[in-house]
């Protein structure tokens, strides 16, 4: 049976994706923030100890609340750097996607049209989207599709 891991799979868009995959008889692990918190790299590493491979990986996470640039703290930048960028990088460096598999990146329109009130989300989601584009060429050589 095909296996899928859906980050943020317990509510919102992630839950809808999880439910849709289940209707086509895919074994879905709908990971909540309790199972993996991408803002906490120790949580990511612990998750990866138990989840070493999959056929389908859905990279999905919430984002920061709208905030004017001058009110964003250093802690905000660090927290969302991990949640929206480094957590996903760590996952891709350490999980095996099976041959013929898929990786889906659920992101935001801010990667194409930055939003001044969502500057953290705009910056980190766009940065990871670029990494994802570069990696898609490497994954394609292994018959893994990046969407």
PLM feature spans:
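Hydrophobic positions on the long internal alpha-helix
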Residues: 58, 87-95, 131-132
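Helix N-cap/beta-alpha junction loops of NAD(P)-dependent oxidoreductase domains
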Residues: 64-68, 100, 112-115
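Catalytic loop of short-chain dehydrogenase/reductase
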Residues: 104-128, 132-141
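Catalytic Tyr-X3-Lys loop
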Residues: 63, 70-89, 104, 121, ...
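Flexible cofactor-recognition loop at the NAD(P)H-binding site
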Residues: 11, 62-65, 109
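Rossmann-fold cofactor-recognition segment
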Residues: 31-42
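Rossmann-fold scaffold of SDR-type NAD(P)-dependent oxidoreductases
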Residues: 7, 54-62, 84, 105, ...
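N-terminal Rossmann NAD(P)H-binding glycine-rich loop of SDR-like oxidoreductase domains
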Residues: 10, 14, 18
